[in-house]
Curated annotation (Swiss-Prot):
Protein name: NADH-ubiquinone oxidoreductase chain 3
Gene Ontology terms, MF aspect: NADH dehydrogenase (ubiquinone) activity
The keyword Membrane belongs to this UniProt entry's keyword annotation: yes
Topology term for the membrane: Multi-pass membrane protein
UniProtKB keywords: Electron transport, Membrane, Mitochondrion, NAD, Respiratory chain, Translocase, Transmembrane, Transmembrane helix, Transport, Ubiquinone
Annotated Gene Ontology cellular component terms: mitochondrial membrane; NADH dehydrogenase complex
Keyword NAD: yes
Principal location: mitochondrion
Residue intervals passing through the bilayer: 3-23, 56-76, 87-107
Root EC class: translocase
Protein EC: 7.1.1.2
Location of this chain's protein in the cell: Mitochondrion membrane
Pfam families: Oxidored_q4 (PF00507)
Length: 116
């Protein structure tokens, strides 16, 4: 128990010291070089402060949603080894139906249209 306490104390102390140094170390007044964007040693082609399209974020969130669906359904073949494989089938069908209804809703609302 004493070893765990020592390791936790060292970890917290080291983290606090490094966090404090990271706030004190940089200069207070930033110059133009630090505020300019850097693109592999070349001058930037356009403004680096242009906002992204909201449609991009919507497509990205939908991709993550369906990627998570696949991650949840990958262990499904091992579900038939449970005591009640029909319950596993019912739950997986419910998840697929819910996500399919969500996709149909996004499609009908025009959320998947990239150009307006």
């Amino acid at each position: 128990m004493n070893l765990i306490t020592t390791i936790i104390t060292i970890t917290i102390t080291l983290s606090a010291v490094l966090a404090t140094i990271s706030f004190w170390l940089p200069q207070i007044s930033p110059d133009a070089e630090k505020l300019s964007p850097y693109e592999c040693g070349f001058d930037p082609l356009g403004s680096a402060r242009l906002p992204f399209s909201l449609r991009f974020f919507l497509i990205a969130i939908l991709f993550l949603l369906f990627d998570l669906e696949i991650a949840l359904l990958l262990p499904l073949p091992w579900g038939d080894q449970l005591d009640t494989p029909t319950l596993t089938l019912i739950w997986s069908t419910a998840v697929l139906a819910l996500l399919t209804l969500g996709l149909i809703y996004e499609w009908t609302q025009g959320g998947l249209e990239w150009a307006e």
